[in-house]
Swiss-Prot record:
<dbReference type="Pfam" id="PF04349">
    <property type="entry name" value="MdoG"/>
</dbReference>
<protein>
    <recommendedName>
        <fullName>Glucans biosynthesis protein G</fullName>
    </recommendedName>
</protein>
<comment type="similarity">
    <text>Belongs to the OpgD/OpgG family.</text>
</comment>
<dbReference type="InterPro" id="IPR011013">
    <property type="entry name" value="Gal_mutarotase_sf_dom"/>
</dbReference>
<dbReference type="InterPro" id="IPR013783">
    <property type="entry name" value="Ig-like_fold"/>
</dbReference>
<keyword id="KW-0732">Signal</keyword>
<dbReference type="InterPro" id="IPR023704">
    <property type="entry name" value="MdoG_OpgG"/>
</dbReference>
<keyword id="KW-0574">Periplasm</keyword>
<dbReference type="GO" id="GO:0003824">
    <property type="term" value="F:catalytic activity"/>
</dbReference>
<dbReference type="InterPro" id="IPR014718">
    <property type="entry name" value="GH-type_carb-bd"/>
</dbReference>
<dbReference type="InterPro" id="IPR014438">
    <property type="entry name" value="Glucan_biosyn_MdoG/MdoD"/>
</dbReference>
<feature type="signal peptide">
    <location>
        <begin position="1"/>
        <end position="25"/>
    </location>
</feature>
<dbReference type="InterPro" id="IPR014756">
    <property type="entry name" value="Ig_E-set"/>
</dbReference>
<dbReference type="GO" id="GO:0030246">
    <property type="term" value="F:carbohydrate binding"/>
</dbReference>
<comment type="function">
    <text>Involved in the biosynthesis of osmoregulated periplasmic glucans (OPGs).</text>
</comment>
<dbReference type="GO" id="GO:0030288">
    <property type="term" value="C:outer membrane-bounded periplasmic space"/>
</dbReference>
<comment type="pathway">
    <text>Glycan metabolism; osmoregulated periplasmic glucan (OPG) biosynthesis.</text>
</comment>
């Protein structure tokens, strides 16, 4: 079972009950629409008690296997806007398997919202026989646009399951996912999974380079309104505007959340023999903090749940990155991990005090997402209030931030006895090409144990530099910090790492 099936086929929520209720309108008619309407609906929804979902389906769809569900395919020739030859097309996901919740979808054109009707003959069902004349509804949708070439509509984004969505860019494959909101992620009380329950898809103009999606979110603790402006390209960009209306105080709200997978890599090798040297959708967390400091934290597959917190004020950006881009370091012809996108979240406006959180969960299989990252405000999001945030998501091979400093591109760890470790860090970047080699030095600190044998030297095999050091007498989890300097001036980002025996 795929990890995204596990994570996204979760909480299913009821259809919108607020009045006016566009989902309850005559489905052959249209209603007036403006973007503020979604906020009004979310605010009204939050003022009412939460209602548990009704996700009932006929047995033929409720009990599907993963492979059987995959046979439920939307017919591409029936795609929304295909006949109009517009720059975007939309195909829909059928309900079934883990995706039992119905989402209501509207098309918006000329200020009017028209319900997109479910028609069974829009799908091919394989061996699954749907009940005749049933309005079974949709589980989600995917967006297609010319990405690789002008005469073919590639899949560029998908919204399916809970509040999950993902995207790709030119030359890449799906990898990590984003979410509309996370609640209590990593908390002992258990996580709550909000759900996008209604979508409004704005019809793009001929020649448009972007598409707008509005969404209504609901869960036990909060309702919310979202506006996504989606621009596919060499980097696929989502401009996200969200307004949250909590029913209760949200102590642990995760903003701009993202989830990924890290099974093993050079810093955290596989426990059992594997023909691949690395298996991961992301290999590190990058942070550009409010003080202008650039941080890099390689990911791990820990023995126990790990939660890391990077306190900040008005962060400039953070994201789960896939820096290793060489097939030779993965050797997986099927998964092609070197083609998985990175995801960078760029806050816009004042996000005040809080922390970038990193959650690392033990896993034995690559089919499970075990990495999560998000921004958690220091102050709770209070009930009965309106909390507005704007940010930009960049899906692509790299971050959009300047590359003035050298970057750590590989972290290797070797055992030296029971409690000692050798760390070997490789760096790359144009900044290293102009340094005075005699003045280059590594600065390494640890909150426990002892740092020995710090060596900084050119790495001609990769056109960069290498920093190595020993961590000695370390018997407890150790927080490490390293930076490469030319004299007293940093020429690299800051490398952070938690070593656990």
């Amino acid at each position: 079972m795929n990890r995204r099936q596990v994570l996204t086929g979760l909480a299913a929520l009821p259809l919108l009950q607020a009045k006016p209720d566009p989902a309850a309108a005559d489905r052959s008619s249209s209603i007036d629409f403006d973007p503020w309407m979604v906020r009004k609906l979310a605010r009204e929804l939050a003022s009412k008690p939460y209602e548990a979902p009704d996700s009932s389906l006929p047995a033929s769809l409720n009990d599907l296997s993963y492979d059987a569900y995959r046979s439920l395919r939307f017919r591409p020739e029936r795609a929304l806007w295909r006949a109009e030859n517009l720059p975007f097309q939309v195909q829909f996901f059928h309900r079934g398997f883990l995706y039992k919740n119905r989402v209501t979808i509207f098309e918006v054109a000329d200020g009017k919202a028209r319900h997109v009707p479910y028609r069974a003959d829009d799908f091919s069902f394989g061996d699954v026989a749907p009940p005749p004349d049933s309005d079974l509804g949709f589980a989600g949708f995917r967006i297609h646009a010319p990405l690789q070439r002008a005469d073919y509509y590639d899949e560029v984004s998908a919204f399916l399951g809970a509040a999950y969505f993902r995207a790709v860019t030119k030359g890449e494959r799906y990898g990590l996912s984003a979410r509309g909101l996370s609640i209590d992620t990593g908390q002992s009380s258990g996580e709550e999974f909000p759900l996008f329950k209604t979508f409004w898809l704005e019809r793009p103009a001929p020649g448009a380079s972007s598409m707008v999606v509005h969404a209504l979110l609901d869960s036990k603790s909060v309702a919310g309104a979202y506006r996504f402006t989606i621009r596919p390209g060499d980097t696929t960009v989502f401009d996200v505007e969200m307004a949250l209306y909590p029913r209760v105080d949200l102590q642990h709200a995760g903003l701009a959340p993202m989830t990924s997978m890290f099974l093993f890599g050079p810093n955290d090798p596989a426990d059992t023999p594997d023909f691949r040297a690395a298996v991961h959708d992301s290999d590190g967390l990058a942070i550009f903090n409010g003080s202008g400091e650039e941080l890099w934290r390689p990911l791990c597959n820990p023995k126990d749940l790990q939660i890391s917190s990077f306190g900040d004020r008005n962060p400039r950006g953070f994201g789960l990155m896939q820096r290793e881009r060489s097939f030779a370091n993965y050797q997986d012809l099927e998964s092609r991990y070197e083609l998985r996108p990175s995801l960078w979240a760029e806050p816009i406006g004042d996000w005040t005090d809080g922390a970038v959180k990193l959650i690392e969960i033990p896993t034995r299989e690559e089919v499970h997402d075990n990495i999560a990252s998000f921004w958690e405000p220091k102050q709770p999001l209070r009930a009965k209030g309106e909390h507005i945030y704007t940010y930009r998501l960049h899906w692509g091979p790299d971050t959009p931030k300047p590359k003035g400093l050298a970057r750590f591109v590989r972290t290797g760890v070797s055992a030296r006895g029971d409690n000692d470790r050798l760390f070997v860090l490789d760096l790359a970047g144009d900044r290293l090409k102009t340094v005075d080699a005699a003045a280059v030095r590594g600065v390494v600190t640890a909150d426990k144990g002892e740092i020995r044998n710090i060596v900084t030297q050119p790495n001609p095999a990769m056109g960069g530099w290498r920093l190595s050091f020993d961590l000695a007498q370390a018997r407890a989890p150790v927080e490490l910090r390293a930076v490469v300097c030319e004299g007293d001036a940093a020429v690299s980002e800051v490398w952070l790492y938690r070593w656990t025996p």
